[in-house]
Amino acid sequence: MRRFLQICLVVLPLLAASCSPGSSSRRPPLVSFRPQDIPLVPRTVSQINREVRIDRDYMPTSTRARRYYSGSLSPRFITIHSTANPSGDACSHAKYLNKGKSGSLCWHFTVDQYHAVQHLPLNRRGHHADKGGPGDRYSIAIEMCEVRSHSKAKTYDRAAKLTASLMTQYNIPLRNVVPHYYWSGKACPGPLLDEKRPGYKWSWFISRVDYYYRCLNGGKQHVS
C-alpha cells in the first residue's frame, strides 16, 4: 500500500473543499493522480468480472427496502462505501439484507477479499447515500468489507476491478466515481479517507481504478 501511496499526487482540488452535503448540482471535482506505471494486462469485461467473481444473491422483493426504496436506475455515478463492520464478510451482509434486517437500506454490491456479492439488479436504485437524493437515484453502490482477518489490499483491488468494469459497461467517467463522503459528508469509506476526508488514500484508489479501466479499454482513459 505504501508503494502505491507514494506515486499518488495530492487531490487538487481536494474533494473536501467542494463536497458538502447536497452538492449534487455540481460536477464532482477532478481527482489528481499519477497513472500507475505498470504494464497493462488487456482484459475484456467478462474476463475481469470473472476475476472479481460476482455472485448474484438478490434481495427478496418482499423486503421493505425493495418494496419502497428501489425505483428504476440509469447509472451515472459509482459510489464507494465501506461497511465499518470488522466481523462481516460479503456473504454475511447478503444474509443481513435478504432477511430484511437493514430496514430501508440497500445497495448493489458488497466486496471482500474473495468475491463480490450483488444484491440488486443494476437497473434498480439502492438506498445508501443521501436518503433518496441524487446519490441514491443515480449511482451504483459498492460496499467494501472491513473484516479484520481479510487482506485490505485484496478487497480494495477487487473493488477497483469491479468499478472499472462498471465504468466500461455504463460509460461512467472516472470523475463520477465518488466516495459516500461526496453525497452526505459522512466519513465513508473510512479506510480510504485521510482525517475523515478524501486525500492520498482516495487518490491511490482512483489510480487503481484508472489502471484497470485502461486494461479494459486499450490503454485509453475516461477521466471526465
Enumerate the predicted regions with their spans.
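Cell-envelope and extracellular/periplasmic
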Residues: 135, 140-149
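Hydrophobic helical h-region of N-terminal Sec-dependent signal peptides
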Residues: 6-17
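Basic/polar, cationic surfaces and motifs that engage anionic cell-wall
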Residues: 19-56, 148-224
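Soluble periplasmic/extracytoplasmic beta-strand elements of cell-envelope proteins
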Residues: 79, 108, 141-143, 178
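A structural motif
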Residues: 132-138, 206-208
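N-terminal catalytic cores of peptidoglycan-degrading enzymes
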Residues: 19-131, 135
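Positively charged n-region of N-terminal signal peptides that target proteins for export
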Residues: 1-4
